[in-house]
Amino acid sequence: MSDIAERVKKIVAEHLGVEPEKVTENASFIDDLGADSLDTVELVMAFEEAFNTEIPDDAAETILTVGDAIKFLEKNAG
């Protein structure tokens, strides 16, 4: 697992208060991890801060799963 993937999973587990083992790449923030729309906005902001990057609104709307976040950040962070 990449460093980015590990960091994303840790951020998601901490922000949503879920067990780390539930945070899989296929897990939907809303359907599987119990997030609401405010949680997803807060997650995007946490990713931006942790990875020192900006996630445009149109891109943020496509980040629906843990794997989506990892793929976006692997391509755009740093």
From Swiss-Prot:
GO terms for biological process: lipid A biosynthetic process. It is found in: Cytoplasm. The modification O-(pantetheine 4'-phosphoryl)serine is found at residue 37. 4'-phosphopantetheine is transferred from CoA to a specific serine of apo-ACP by AcpS. This modification is essential for activity because fatty acids are bound in thioester linkage to the sulfhydryl of the prosthetic group. Keywords: Cytoplasm, Fatty acid biosynthesis, Fatty acid metabolism, Lipid biosynthesis, Lipid metabolism, Phosphopantetheine, Phosphoprotein. InterPro entries: ACP, ACP-like_sf, PP-bd_ACP, Ppantetheine_attach_site. GO terms for molecular function: acyl binding; acyl carrier activity. It holds the Pfam family PP-binding. GO terms for cellular component: cytosol; membrane. Residues 2-77 form the Carrier domain. Pathway: Lipid metabolism; fatty acid biosynthesis. HAMAP family: Acyl_carrier. Belongs to the acyl carrier protein (ACP) family. Carrier of the growing fatty acid chain in fatty acid biosynthesis. This is Acyl carrier protein. It comes from Azorhizobium caulinodans (strain ATCC 43989 / DSM 5975 / JCM 20966 / LMG 6465 / NBRC 14845 / NCIMB 13405 / ORS 571). The gene is acpP.
